Amino acid sequence: MLDISKIAIGNTTNYAETPADSIRVSLLTCSPHDEIYSLYGHTAIRYEDKASKTDIVVNYGMFSFKKPFFVARFVLGLTDYEMGIQDFNDFCYEYQYFGSQVTQQEINLTPEEKGELLKALQDNYANARVYRYNYFYNNCTTKARDIILKSINGKIEYKNAIDKSVSFRDLIHGCNANYSWASFGNDLLLGFKADMQTTREEQQFLPDNLMRDFGQAKIVSADGSARPLVKNTEIIVKGNDHAIAGKTKVTPQFVFITLLLLIAAIVVAEFKTKKRFLWVDISLLLASGLAGLILFVMLFSEHPTTSTNLQIFILCPLNLYWAIYIIKNKRNERKLRKAWTFLSIMLCIGLSGRLIQVYAEGMPLLALSLLLKNCCNLYATRKND
């Protein structure tokens, strides 16, 4: 790991007096590759000084899976990422290895602004290298954007229009279209706040969106003069067609359609044999209850879009209690009717929530499967009472 503090800042007035400015600052945008963590791309800053033969990449996306409880901390929004400094050639080699494209946009900064940016990067590296990662609001892309824009003496104006009707969920769907199970996992954990409209700045959490906006932006100085934010754009690492894998055949939709048909067959078998396969109900309650515990934990996550998730009425942690309740009262029709009634009401609420929240693929089918089984059980308790 390189150390940015070893790069001399110099006096910003000297920058203005330098006849040939040897410093270039660029935004690097990396396309996705086949690893799940890379599906949304990546952003970094290149700092190049030909006079001192310095060529480094400032990378706000450094993390380690080996840290204790990494997955649990990530889910709860307690993950710390780190600002790292890499050799430019090493950085490019990594993305070339994965087959990702790297696009470079040279930022049109004045010598004074370059000096301010370097000071900010050095201060960031020395005093705030580790930061609390937030997927939508504080990630490698937003960190790079913010530190660049804060160094600019002027107002940023964007020439391109954006679709303000899109939500965070819409944006990530565009990135994981080939990964149905990754999309399912995201949609399962995100609440209805992820379906709200987004601003331009919010949409810039995705590297491609920031690259697009920077390419269409200009800097307006206090005297009214304007200059493009990006001086020039070039592809410095070419990608290949194998970076992203194809779609999987076994999708969540397929799995839940199969489950619905299986439960329908079990219901028919119960009516024909006049027997109840209580082990099926207990298995469904335990499985949905355990999954519901994850949604319950997400209510306390620091991620801003997970605190209100109506899918918890379908995958409900209370199902664990009702599984035990039904086992204890399996011969008491009145108490069983109470259980099946409550469970059916919860599922109806969950299905109604689909009107205001986008659910994970197949979740309505899962709710219908569970509701079908519960309603048949409810009918049986009334008939036998």
Model-found features: residue ranges?
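A cross-kingdom signal targeting lumenal/periplasmic-facing segments of multi-pass membrane
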Residues: 64-154
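Activation targets extended, charge/polar-rich intrinsically disordered C-terminal tails
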Residues: 123-325, 331-335, 343-385
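Bacterial Sec-dependent N-terminal signal peptides
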Residues: 1-16, 383-385
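Glycine-rich catalytic cores of cysteine/serine-nucleophile enzymes that process amide/ester linkages
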Residues: 21-99
